[in-house]
Amino acid sequence: KGVSDNMQFIHCAAQDVASHLETPVDLILFHAVLEWVADPRSVLQTLWSVLRPGGVLSLMFYNAHGLLMHNMVAGNFDYVQAGMPKKKKRTLSPDYPRDPAQVYLWLEEGGWQIMGKTGVRVFHDYLREKHQQRDCYEALLELETRYCRQEPYITLGRYIHVTARKPQSKDKV
């Protein structure tokens, strides 16, 4: 049997996930959601409450630094000077791009042990010649993979992926 027999997928508001579970889970995939919620700390607390001790959170969020860098490279100086206000109510641009240091602090304050950080699209979105994203994909992928877990490139990624562990109760300080 494959692992899919041991998997359960729940589609609901993050704040409501506890009401859909009977027992704590081993792994939570929470990708591209944190930047859409007004109260991320309470969402992280909810995720903590449904994860078993020793379980892992896979968290990916839209990076405010990546947004700033993208706009600077594009020459959108006035927009950056204005604080990069969201232009339209209904758009695919997230409502709350997250500062990585703030997210890391929320995780640590919540008791999570950060295991790893990875920048996602640390070079791809900044290429001046957009055709290179396609035409030079193999070389770009190799370089993305080489640098995506090193600073300052982590912090320049358009998204940041964090793996964090909920300690076993005996591990807690």
Set out the residue ranges of the language-model regions.
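Conserved SAM-binding strand-loop segment of SAM-dependent methyltransferases
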Residues: G2-D16
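Short conserved loop adjoining the S-adenosyl-L-methionine
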Residues: D16-E22
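A conserved beta-strand element that flanks and buttresses the S-adenosyl-L-methionine
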Residues: L29
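Short catalytic micro-motifs in class I SAM-dependent methyltransferases
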Residues: A32-V33
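A short glycine-rich, Lys/Arg-flanked "PGG" loop and its adjoining helix->strand segment in the class I
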Residues: R41-V56
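Conserved class I S-adenosyl-L-methionine
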Residues: V56-G83
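Short alpha-helix
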Residues: L92-K117
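A C-terminal cap/extension of S-adenosyl-L-methionine-dependent methyltransferases
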Residues: G116-V173
